[in-house]
Amino acid sequence: MPRSQKNDNFIDKTFTVVADILIKVLPTSNREKQAFTYYRDGMSAQAEGEYAEALQNYYQALKLEIDPYDRSYILYNIGLIHTSNGKHGRALEYYYQALKRNPSLPQALNNIAVIYHYRAEQATEKYQSEVAKILYNKAADYWNEAIRLTPTNYLEAQSWLKQRENI
């Protein structure tokens, strides 16, 4: 039984019912419907912290989904899981793939910036100031782009960028 059919969360159930109705009435291929079902089940598993199950669903969705925009969100969610698991290098790969298909994905830009900022802090702790400087600059570049796309978001990043200008 698909995960979406055994969910006990009211909001998830509501989303599932609405999604099922849309899948039935929208003029999409069976392949697209199946891809969306895997994606939806992946989101549900991810929300419950079942990352291995979520990844399986996302990988199945990737095999079926052909639309670049939709693929970008699948790739982004895979990146989120790798970030949560501390696999930052792997997460970056998926965020970059998502951006290649959807350059206007500010959340991927933000997450890339967060990883570079984290790595810069690690370099600073190891007294690798030149490496840290490069990584902080990369973080700033990605945050600036994310903020350009969504000026009212990423307030902490905006604050950090302003402080950085004043140093």
UniProtKB/Swiss-Prot annotation:
GO terms of biological process kind: photosynthesis
Any single GO CC term annotated in Swiss-Prot or TrEMBL for this entry: chloroplast thylakoid membrane
Predominant location: plastid
Keyword terms of this UniProt record: Chloroplast, Membrane, Photosynthesis, Plastid, Repeat, Thylakoid, TPR repeat
Subcellular location, record wording: Plastid, Chloroplast thylakoid membrane
Pfam family, one: TPR_1
Membrane topology: Peripheral membrane protein
TPR repeats: 35-68, 72-105, 120-153
Entries under HAMAP family matching the protein: Ycf3
Free-text function comment from the UniProt entry: Essential for the assembly of the photosystem I (PSI) complex. May act as a chaperone-like factor to guide the assembly of the PSI subunits.
Family membership: Belongs to the Ycf3 family.
Name of this chain's protein: Photosystem I assembly protein Ycf3
Organism of origin: Tupiella akineta
Taxonomic classification: Eukaryota, Viridiplantae, Chlorophyta, Ulvophyceae, OUU clade
